[in-house]
C-alpha cells in the first residue's frame, strides 16, 4: 500500500515509552504467535495473558478473528490482503508496546516476509516469536469450527495448510509442539522464557 506521508510530521509528546513502563511496573514487548489454523495459538495466548495478569502485568491479546471484525474488516484472504492485514496489525502492536503494554498476538501470519517486517519494527529484545508447530492432520482433527472440512471440500479458498502455503519460521524464539505439549505446559514454557530473558 502506497504511503502518503510527505506532509506529515511525527509528533512526540512529553511522556515516552520508558515513562509508561515505569507506570505499569514492567517492560513492554510483543509475544507473536504464528502457526496453522487450530494449532493452539489463541488458546495458549489467552492462558499466557491470564498468568501475566495475575502477576500484575498490563496485557492485551490481539486475535486474528477479532481484528477482522473491525480494523481489518475490509480485507479478504488474497495474498495481498493477508499481507496488508499483518502490516496493519504490526503497526497497531507497535503503538501498544509504546504505550507500555505487553501485547500477545495470535495470527496465522503465514508468510515469512511479513513476519520479518513486523519484527523489524521492534528492538531485538522486544519481539518474541512463538511458533505453534503442529501437523495439519492434528489441526484438522481438533478443529471445532469445521473450517478444515470446508477447505478440503473447496468451500473456503486460500486456506492455509490446505490450499495456501504456510512458511515455517526458521529461528523463532520459542517453538511449541502443540501435538505433544498441553496448553498449560506450553504456557509455562513461555512464562519461563519471559522470566529468564526479561527478568519479569
Swiss-Prot record:
Enzyme class: transferase
Signal peptide (from-to): none
A Gene Ontology biological process term: sulfate assimilation
GO molecular function: adenylylsulfate kinase activity; ATP binding
Gene3D superfamilies from the UniProt entry: P-loop containing nucleotide triphosphate hydrolases (3.40.50.300)
Active site: 109 (phosphoserine intermediate)
UniProt-listed InterPro entries: APS_kinase, P-loop_NTPase
Pathway terms, separated by semicolons: Sulfur metabolism; hydrogen sulfide biosynthesis; sulfite from sulfate: step 2/3
UniProt family annotation: Belongs to the APS kinase family.
Protein task: Catalyzes the synthesis of activated sulfate.
NCBIfam families per UniProt: apsK, PRK03846.1
HAMAP family: Adenylyl_sulf_kinase
Name of this protein: Adenylyl-sulfate kinase
Organism: Thermodesulfovibrio yellowstonii (strain ATCC 51303 / DSM 11347 / YP87)
Amino acid at each position: 500500500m502506497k504511503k502518503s506521508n510527505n506532509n506529515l510530521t511525527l509528533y512526540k509528546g512529553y511522556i515516552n515509552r520508558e515513562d509508561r513502563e515505569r507506570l505499569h511496573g514492567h517492560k513492554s514487548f510483543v509475544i507473536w504467535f504464528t502457526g496453522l489454523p487450530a494449532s493452539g495459538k489463541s488458546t495458549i495466548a489467552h492462558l499466557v495473558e491470564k498468568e501475566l495478569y495475575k502477576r500484575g502485568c498490563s496485557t492485551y491479546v490481539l486475535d486474528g478473528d477479532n481484528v477482522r471484525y473491525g480494523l481489518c474488516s475490509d480485507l479478504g484472504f488474497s495474498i495481498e490482503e493477508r499481507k496488508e492485514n499483518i502490516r496493519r496489525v504490526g503497526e497497531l502492536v507497535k503503538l501498544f508496546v509504546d504505550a507500555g503494554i505487553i501485547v500477545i498476538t495470535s495470527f496465522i501470519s503465514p508468510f515469512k516476509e511479513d513476519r520479518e517486517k513486523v519484527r523489524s519494527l521492534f528492538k531485538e529484545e522486544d519481539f518474541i516469536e512463538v511458533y505453534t508447530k503442529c501437523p495439519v492432520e492434528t489441526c484438522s482433527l481438533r478443529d471445532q469450527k469445521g473450517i478444515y472440512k470446508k477447505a478440503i471440500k473447496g468451500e473456503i479458498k486460500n486456506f492455509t495448510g490446505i490450499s495456501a502455503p504456510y512458511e515455517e519460521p526458521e529461528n523463532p524464539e520459542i517453538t511449541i509442539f502443540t501435538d505433544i505439549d498441553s496448553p498449560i505446559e506450553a504456557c509455562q514454557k513461555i512464562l519461563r522464557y519471559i522470566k529468564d530473558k526479561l527478568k519479569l
